[in-house]
Curated annotation (Swiss-Prot):
There is a cross-link at residue 91 (Glycyl lysine isopeptide (Lys-Gly) (interchain with G-Cter in SUMO2)). The lineage of its organism: Eukaryota, Metazoa, Chordata, Craniata, Vertebrata. The keyword Zinc-finger does not apply. The modification Phosphoserine is found at residues 123, 276, 514, 584. This is Cold shock domain-containing protein E1. The modification Phosphothreonine is found at residue 761. SMART domains: CSP. One of its GO terms (biological process) is nuclear-transcribed mRNA catabolic process, no-go decay. Residues 748-789 form the SUZ-C domain.
Amino acid sequence: MSFDPNLLHNNGHNGYPNGTSAALRETGVIEKLLTSYGFIQCSERQARLFFHCSQYNGNLQDLKVGDDVEFEVSSDRRTGKPIAIKLVKIKPEIHPEERMNGQVVCAVPHNLESKSPAAPGQSPTGSVCYERNGEVFYLTYTSEDVEGNVQLETGDKINFVIDNNKHTGAVSARNIMLLKKKQARYQGVVCAMKEAFGFIERGDVVKEIFFHYSEFKGDLETLQPGDDVEFTIKDRNGKEVATDVRLLPQGTVIFEDISIEHFEGTVTKVIPKVPSKNQNDPLPGRIKVDFVIPKELPFGDKDTKSKVTLLEGDHVRFNISTDRRDKLERATNIEVLSNTFQFTNEAREMGVIAAMRDGFGFIKCVDRDARMFFHFSEILDGNQLHIADEVEFTVVPDMLSAQRNHAIRIKKLPKGTVSFHSHSDHRFLGTVEKEATFSNPKTTSPNKGKDKEAEDGIIAYDDCGVKLTIAFQAKDVEGSTSPQIGDKVEFSISDKQRPGQQIATCVRLLGRNSNSKRLLGYVATLKDNFGFIETANHDKEIFFHYSEFSGDVDSLELGDMVEYSLSKGKGNKVSAEKVNKTHSVNGITEEANPTIYSGKVIRPLRGVDPTQIEYQGMIEIVEEGDMKGEVYPFGIVGMANKGDCLQKGESVKFQLCVLGQNAQTMAYNITPLRRATVECVKDQFGFINYEVGDSKKLFFHVKEVQDGIELQAGDEVEFSVILNQRTGKCSACNVWRVCEGPKAVAAPRPDRLVNRLKNITLDDASAPRLMVLRQPRGPDNSMGFGAERKIRQAGVID
């Protein structure tokens, strides 16, 4: 619209179109205000009039939308449309103010830079609410309606006056006063919990805040470190504390944004295994990244994907984490790249997995004699290792013990990569000059040092007329028997991967030294595939395997005299070999003392109680006399019945005899004194009231009862106890009846059985009744069935 102010003169317009000269003034409200013109909404009639800013009598800067004005109406000379002229701003009427209490529902936006700017003369609005008679009413307001330099926030408590625009009828809030700021709620994650208090890592700033358990609104038993919470901050004794702590759904609080893209870099500083006392940096590690502008990113001990040791120079892949609170960037999800060993200065070694335990294992090294300890956490690429897997690793000193090494950064290799020896197919013959020994077998734990190191043996051999010697290890011996000094052996020569070292491998025993000493002993124990021999001095037992016995093993019995040689097997354990049965008499004097003594077993043989250390049993004389209380040892030879199982506390009778090469006086011809009653007899077996070990009853088979007597419950018997060496269970043998027990009297049939049928009543008279036709007779006077059972043809009736 174009407008010429010069058209407004006495001849250019009049008050109304009818030409009346009286100038009537009207009132209205500024509805729209632009740079040079605006529009007025008339109060007395439905009309919207144009006005030019030059027609305003006053400072145009004070005029704003919503102001009441008084004006005259004229007409545009060119268009004939009514326009407002001679505008005067009307002072607002003073009304009695009723102030209301309410709160901010939606605050006026503080920053409108990102939004389209408001039109000139228009202000952004917010909303408030108040309650009256149980109803809630909402009003708009602008920042100009707020008293004082106060920035209102949603939730603030306020006091205001309700303003009713008489021209537009719009209701709004004005003269707004702030009563109480809303308490801010903060979020965070519980990072530590003590006995009565804890700490929360705040989500708005990089800081921890204290809270007492009494401030937690919920079940304290469910609160754990890592839970998301919200809280209010209050000042107590000059320190900020968290109050009104409440749980939030898991995942509500997010501290950082992790990049989707992966980056690669080089480790320039590793995290020390043992942090120094003055180290305060929570992210001590550094990774150099080759961006357009190279930069170093920090990382902490929780930023690696695995617990594999990082070394300086490692090539790694990672994500970048950006903290939302302070925009700090760090490397996270760090994993070692497979080609990293091309860039580090570490010396890599190879070996084979030799043993696996719970969380750790041992590697048999190519370049070292000792097995190398390792933790499962040091396995690269998340591979699952098994015994005999070939691996590559780095050896570093243990941080806790400088004398020990362990393997780190273990990488699985393809089968066939690792080779310990390169040996020829040629076999050599030689004689053992020094025996090889194993290390102490109790060194499987990584926390225990070795008590005794393994020692190499020496073999003398002849090569093209030249007498030479070569070392061999006990682990390279084939079979279960270790060669001894003077034994003939066959072996191969192997070059180790360590240069200049040769060792005998695949050592096989060909023959024992013919001059080796032969020993005598007595069979003390027989198991499934092995046994024990009592030495000639009757004070020890020697292990032997049935494969070392020359003859039929089934012919061996307890107490048999045998001849054998001693050898050292794996683990430096002594065992008997070349065991032969012999009938020579050795070790027992011609005459035993004829006096028979009564005694009590105070310690059984080790075969009866494997938990005891000593092999020999001990018997104490209990009969009155000068020898009462004296104690004598005994072995398997001293038993009258070699299969008898003497237990601690049993009464025995015995003689004394000088036995063994050291002429020791021992108990001999020992016979137990056992009496007990028969508990019950079944078909082919029974039980005796006699306690053996954990069992209260002793089993016996009827074939063990002497003279073919049929035992009855209550009979008193004498017997021997034998121990089944294979099953470990005891049973009675050689059972003699000493006296007969009381006869069992047949009890009459109970009346309840005789009268049962008589007591049956049936309420239904038509129901079938059971009637006794004849009384049954006993088997001695039985009539039985008169009709003989015959084979009948189906379908044919006689």
